[in-house]
A protein has these predicted regions:
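Conserved phosphate/anionic-ligand binding catalytic regions in large, soluble enzymes, centered on
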Residues: 176-184
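Short, low-complexity Ser/Thr-rich regulatory SLiMs
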Residues: 157-158, 172-174
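Anionic group-transfer/hydrolysis microenvironments
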Residues: 71-72, 171, 182
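C-terminal accessory segment of soluble enzyme catalytic cores
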Residues: 155, 190-238
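Two-metal-ion RNase H-like nuclease active-site motif
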Residues: 168
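N-terminal lobe of the biotin/lipoate ligase/transferase fold
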Residues: 2-7, 11-165, 190, 194, ...
């Protein structure tokens, strides 16, 4: 793991960055703290999200955007069906977000916005803002993406095929979000072969590297994603 301290306050583990929380210099965001955590095991990051969400609900923590990568892991949202899981017994973590099964791994930017919504009932509006932010980020690398009616996430749709480049799954409690998005930059795409990502059997998956036909790194893309997501969160969070 990169840049992580494990502390034990009041009898439980807490995940804390070793460096200051930062904001993208291109964005003025007085309300949103940004934490870059590097590579973090999924369950530990999930526990950390819950801790921050509880703090935001209680008014004790600021709105927060976590950006990180995960070691290879499959996670299943609440709508995942038994026949959508890997057939070879590969372990899957069941989580409390919406959506179905997906994969996380290195080469993927994962973002967890934990914010108090200005309109606590506008969950769809929140998802649309995140989608628009990722669409704008991809466009800066000359990759044209779009929303797909009634299918969350960010897609590429052309004469070749329909393929997903970013997945979104969230949970909202007392008007505060958690979980978030995953944008494929240059991951090992073979990990998707074991599942039907997000439950879709009639579409594919892709990455920025595949669409560009060249290597591209998480470190190149992360500041652009951060900038656009912060702009979106400023519009919809308290």
């Amino acid at each position: 793991m990169v840049g992580i301290n494990w502390l034990r306050p009041e009898g439980y583990l807490r995940l804390r960055p070793m460096y200051a929380k930062t904001s993208n210099p291109g964005v003025k965001s007085n309300q949103i703290s940004v934490e870059h955590l590097g590579l973090v095991e999924y369950k530990k990051a999930w526990e950390y999200q819950r801790e921050i969400q509880a703090g935001v609900i209680a008014g004790e923590s600021p709105n927060t955007l976590i950006l990180l990568e995960h070691p290879s892991v499959y996670t299943a949202g609440r709508r995942t069906q038994l026949d959508e899981r890997p057939k070879d017994g590969t372990p899957v973590i069941d989580v409390d977000r919406g959506g179905k099964i997906t994969w996380h791994g290195e080469g993927q930017i994962v973002g967890y916005p934990i914010v108090k919504l200005r309109n606590r009932n506008d969950v769809v509006g929140f998802v649309r803002e995140i989608e628009n932010a990722l669409i704008a980020a991809c466009s800066e690398f000359s990759v044209k993406t779009e929303r797909y009616c009634e299918r969350s996430g960010v897609w590429i749709r052309d004469t070749k095929s329909e393929r997903k480049i970013a997945a979104i799954g969230i949970r909202v409690a007392k008007g505060v979000t958690m979980h978030g998005f995953a944008l494929n930059i240059n991951p090992d795409m073979s990990a998707y072969d074991r599942i039907s990502p997000c439950g879709f059997t009639d579409t594919g998956v892709t990455s920025l590297a595949q669409e560009l036909g060249r290597d591209i790194t998480v470190s190149e893309v992360s500041p652009v994603v951060e900038r656009h997501v912060l702009l979106a969160l400023d519009r919809i969070s308290e």
